[in-house]
Amino acid sequence: MKKYAYILLILASVSTMATAQIKIGNYSFKDGSEYTGELKGRKPNGKGKTVFKNGDIYEGQYVKGKREGDGTYTFHDGEKYVGQWYQDQQHGNGTFYFMNNNRYEGMWYTDYQQGEGTMYYYNGDIYVGNWSQDQRSGKGTYTWKAGAQYVGEWKNDKKNGEGA
């Protein structure tokens, strides 16, 4: 019985130490942006919200003061990114909602549409395929609203070759 009581005491101590490191508070970034949320030490770490000086808002995960994990960034002009972050950059799987009502769903790498992704254009057209630094690049299929398609290679955001 004493053995179990001792184990419970150790577990309670470890649990208290772990939660004592994370607290809720505010943090001011050097650029004047204001953060409210979980802090570890004096830096954002965990869930929180930052209101940037220009009116942009980020709500999501932080690690050691940087956006990392899942989060939503709403730009002051109405555009929005919902997805994964790494080292303060859009990185991983995410969706970007453009002001002109286009929507990109797919992979991101250091703030660029990179890898497999789909662009839904405001006029009903759809592109499914590879992206490189925000441009259609490699294999992809563009389908016009009326049903016609181009299936083939892309380079510098333009059809490259005959395609099908």
PLM segments and residue spans:
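Conserved anchor residues at repeat-unit boundaries in beta-strand-based tandem repeats, strongest
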Residues: 34-44, 57-68, 80-91, 103-114, ...
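Sec-dependent N-terminal signal peptides
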Residues: 4-14
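Extracellular beta-strand solenoid repeats
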Residues: 49-51, 72, 95, 118, ...
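N-terminal segments that cap or nucleate solenoid repeat domains
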Residues: 20-57
